[in-house]
């Protein structure tokens, strides 16, 4: 069974990342590698995590012309990762190209999910980029586009999970960032929830980064989260 907890390795150096990884159990959590760490350490770091038998979510949010995104997704799959993502706003053709690029992997292909609306966005900010929808409307619209393209699910705030599940089906995966512990500040995330709240809303996987990586004892935080989940 795949763990619900995805620990975001939000570090700016390899030593700190490895120190935490060595304390984690691949049976208890998956790991997320984002743009910062991937740019710093590259594919070999991802492969090293896979060799440790961790499920790796490669969070690079591909968004480009369809051919480029398809090739990027194929390259990501070559690393043996469990999950990759693209920006849903890239459109139906881009999403379909990403999906098609993974067909050769059959049942061993990574999960392909689409980013809807970043959890740093606040209500009203979409207008600044020319979108008149509300946050829930836009997230739901993009989730339905991802489902039409044949993707496995989406990244979305927990606030939109219920409506996405209603529109796209209970088996449509929802991966939820913006998870904060009750005593944490929101920092640059606007639409946040606690782990327990997100699970109640129906989130399938919770991405938790800074509450873990910035803690004085990250492993204690992980252990407490696992007990709660």
UniProtKB/Swiss-Prot annotation:
Family annotation (InterPro entries): Aldolase_TIM (IPR013785), OMPdecase (IPR014732), OMPdecase_AS (IPR018089), OMPdecase_bac (IPR047596), OMPdeCOase_dom (IPR001754), RibuloseP-bd_barrel (IPR011060)
Enzyme class: lyase
Residues the record marks as active site: 61
Pfam family, one: OMPdecase
Entry-linked SMART domains: OMPdecase
GO molecular function: orotidine-5'-phosphate decarboxylase activity
Binding site residues for substrate: 10, 32, 59-68, 119, 180, 189, 209-210
BP GO annotations: 'de novo' pyrimidine nucleobase biosynthetic process; 'de novo' UMP biosynthetic process
One cellular component term from this protein's GO annotations in UniProt: cytosol
Lyase among keywords: yes
UniProt keyword list: Decarboxylase, Lyase, Pyrimidine biosynthesis
Signal peptide stretch: none
Chemical reaction(s) catalysed: orotidine 5'-phosphate + H(+) = UMP + CO2
Catalytic activity, EC: 4.1.1.23
Pathway noted in the entry: Pyrimidine metabolism; UMP biosynthesis via de novo pathway; UMP from orotate: step 2/2
Job of this protein: Catalyzes the decarboxylation of orotidine 5'-monophosphate (OMP) to uridine 5'-monophosphate (UMP).
Record note on quaternary structure: Homodimer.
Family stated for the protein in its record: Belongs to the OMP decarboxylase family. Type 1 subfamily.
Name used for this protein in its record: Orotidine 5'-phosphate decarboxylase
Encoding gene, per UniProt annotation: pyrF
């Amino acid at each position: 069974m795949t763990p619900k907890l995805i620990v975001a390795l939000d570090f700016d150096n390899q030593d700190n990342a490895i120190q935490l990884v060595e304390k984690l159990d691949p049976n208890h959590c998956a790991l997320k590698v984002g743009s910062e760490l991937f740019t710093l350490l590259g594919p070999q770091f991802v492969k090293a995590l896979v060799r440790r038998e961790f499920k790796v979510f490669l969070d690079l949010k591909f968004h480009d012309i369809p051919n480029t995104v398809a090739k990027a997704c194929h390259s990501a799959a070559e690393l043996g990762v469990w999950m990759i993502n693209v920006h849903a706003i890239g459109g139906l053709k881009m999403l379909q190209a990403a999906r098609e690029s993974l067909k050769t992997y059959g049942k061993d292909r990574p999960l392909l999910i689409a980013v809807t609306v970043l959890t740093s966005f606040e209500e009203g900010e979409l207008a600044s980029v020319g979108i008149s929808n509300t946050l829930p409307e836009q997230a739901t619209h993009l989730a339905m586009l991802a489902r039409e393209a044949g993707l496995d699910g989406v990244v979305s705030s927990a606030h939109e999970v219920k409506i996405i599940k209603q529109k796209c089906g209970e088996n449509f995966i929802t991966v939820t960032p913006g998870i904060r512990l009750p005593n944490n500040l929101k920092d640059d995330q606007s639409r946040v929830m606690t782990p327990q709240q997100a699970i109640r809303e129906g989130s399938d996987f919770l991405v938790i980064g800074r509450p873990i990586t910035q803690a004085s004892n990250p492993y204690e935080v992980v252990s407490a989260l696992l007990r709660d989940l």
